[in-house]
């Protein structure tokens, strides 16, 4: 009779350990999945910060510089004599 109760106790303890182990595995899997989703979101934000934002900034800045140098600052036209002197 004593052996039967000890076997039942070990069986219950084994089930408790199994349930705790399964819960830990599920928790670790869910946390890893959520961390990978968070990492993907961070990488997309990093891609936006490092690739798209500088390219948009450079496009806008170069457009401003192009307008500035082509519309506002125009060098005086060279005379024919000045062109000949510069080429010599």
UniProtKB/Swiss-Prot annotation:
Compartment(s) of residence:
Host Golgi apparatus membrane
Give the record's keywords alphabetically: Apoptosis, Host Golgi apparatus, Host membrane, Membrane, Transmembrane, Transmembrane helix
Q: Which InterPro entries match?
A: E_protein_bCoV, E_protein_CoV
Identify the residue ranges that face the Intravirion compartment according to the record: 38-79
Topological region Virion surface: 1-16
User: Where does the sequence pass through the membrane?
Assistant: 17-37
Tell me the Gene Ontology biological-process terms attached to this UniProt entry: disruption of cellular anatomical structure in another organism; viral budding from Golgi membrane
Superkingdom of this entry's organism? Answer: Viruses
The keyword Transmembrane helix appears for this protein: yes
Fetch the Pfam families from UniProt: CoV_E
The UniProt record lists the keyword Transmembrane helix: yes
Gene Ontology cellular component list: host cell Golgi membrane; membrane
On subunit structure and binding partners, the annotation says:
Homopentamer. Interacts with membrane protein M in the budding compartment of the host cell, which is located between endoplasmic reticulum and the Golgi complex. Interacts with Nucleoprotein.
The function of this protein is: Plays a central role in virus morphogenesis and assembly. Acts as a viroporin and self-assembles in host membranes forming pentameric protein-lipid pores that allow ion transport. Also plays a role in the induction of apoptosis.
Q: Which HAMAP family match?
A: BETA_CORONA_E (MF_04204)
> Which family, according to the similarity comment?
Belongs to the betacoronaviruses E protein family.
This protein is called Envelope small membrane protein
Organism of provenance: Murine coronavirus (strain S)
User: What does the record give as the organism's lineage?
Assistant: Viruses, Riboviria, Orthornavirae, Pisuviricota, Pisoniviricetes
Name of the gene encoding the protein in the UniProt record: E
């Amino acid at each position: 009779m004593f052996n039967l109760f000890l076997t039942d106790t070990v069986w219950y303890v084994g089930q408790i350990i199994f349930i705790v182990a399964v819960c830990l595995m599920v928790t670790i899997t869910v946390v890893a999945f959520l961390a990978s989703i968070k990492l993907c979101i961070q990488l997309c934000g990093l891609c936006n910060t490092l690739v798209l934002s500088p390219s948009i900034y450079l496009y806008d800045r170069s457009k401003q510089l192009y307008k500035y140098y082509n519309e506002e600052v125009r060098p005086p036209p060279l005379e024919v004599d000045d062109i000949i002197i510069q080429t010599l």
